[in-house]
Structure formats: structure tokens, C-alpha cells
Amino acid sequence: MHVNKALPVFLLSTLLNLVFNLPTNSSAKEAPLPAHYQQKESSRDGIGKFYMGREISKVMGHLGAGWLERSGREAEERTDILIENLKLKPDDKIADIGAGSGYFTFRLAKLVPQGEVYAVDISPQMLGIIKAKKGKLKAENVTPVLGTTTELNIEDNSVDCVLMVDAYHEFSHPKEMGDAIYRALKPGGKLVLIEYRMEDPLVPIKKLHKMSEKQSIREISATGLVWEETLSVLPQQHFMVFSKPN
């Protein structure tokens, strides 16, 4: 009987590769969540991660850019009223967090000709859309910024206003992002949080993509920002204003 002498070597090599490429128990397991988060079974539209009793929703992503830019959005959401109530000054520096396709970014840029708008998003594809628009519109005061799930990548104490429109509920790390927003705001600066009203069953949006005023204030107040007021000016959304103490 002929024996292939190379076979034992091949088998040994294969075995060693299997052994040394297997993940160890420590690397195979995910790092435990910080105490302020809880992991539970996920619902259809959530990620199974909870913050202050709220399940965090899945992210819409760049495939939803068309919905953000839909022709009927202004009439449905009265985005014109939203922008008017920001009461911006021409030299304000604004951070549009979760900027998406830049729907608000470029509208804001027109109102702050001596200021700047930081369009922050974690999606390179969304930022690609914004960069293309910036060139087309020659919006020199728009700065696209690639953020992370925990950082804005904006200098501390540098912006007068942070705007988040229907984005906060998707943040996978809301506490860390809230802390980052606090750091980015100048003393006296404001955060305007826009979220679909959880309290209104007639708002035709999935549950996890809505937030109640009470829950929103609870979460944002944990950052050190102070709730100032909630304006009842939009047909479907809360317009909540927070400020950073001087």
C-alpha cells in the first residue's frame, strides 16, 4: 500500500491553522454594555438595546435619502416653521446632527452667511450626497463632518446651536452622543431636538421612531443641558429647546 508522506504534514498544518485561528472566549464575546444600557430581546424595529427604558430604533440609513428629500415634506412637517423658530443670527455656527441628505443643512446655510453649518453624519454615503450638493450650490459655509456613534468630531465650545431632526431616537449610544453635544455647545448655546410625538396616535410613524416629551427631557437633561421650552408649532413633532448653562 502506498502512503502519501505529505499527508500527515498537511493534516498537522490544517489542524494548527484551525487552532490558532479560532477566537478565544474573551475575543468571541462582546464587551459588556455600560451600566446605563440594557440588552433585551429586540422588537421588529429596534436593536434590543435600551436606554432609560426606551428601546433604540434601527437606523434608516442612506437608502432613505429620497424620503428625506420628498417634495411634500415641507407641507407635511412645516419645516419652514421649524427653521423660522430657530431664530438664528447671521454669524451663528450650527451643528446639524444626523444631517442625512442635507435637507436642513443647506436651508440653514442661507440664514448664516457669516457663520458655518457643520453637517454631521456617521454615513459616508450621506456625506457624499452633502458634498455633491455643496459643490452644486456653492455653499462655502457648509462643512461635512464624519462623526462616530459616540463623537461629533467638532471642537468643544464651538457651536451656538445644535439641531437634531428625527435622528436622536436612532443613536446607538445616546448618552455618549448627548455628552458630546454638551461639549460642542458654547456656554449659553442651545440644542433644538425635533422628534415625532409619541403621545399622538394619529402621527403615522412607527412607535420606535417617535419620542415623548417626558422621555426626551429625561434623557437630554442627564447630559447637563437644561430644558427651556417645548414649542407647539409643528403638526407632528415636538420642538424642544435645551440650553447649556453659562
Model-derived segments and spans:
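Helix-to-beta-strand junctions that scaffold the AdoMet/dcAdoMet cofactor pocket
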Residues: 89, 112-113, 171-172, 185-187
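A short acidic, Gly/Pro-enriched loop at the edge of an enzyme's catalytic core
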Residues: 150-161
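A short glycine-rich, Lys/Arg-flanked "PGG" loop and its adjoining helix->strand segment in the class I
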Residues: 175-190
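Core SAM-dependent methyltransferase catalytic element
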Residues: 228-229, 233-246
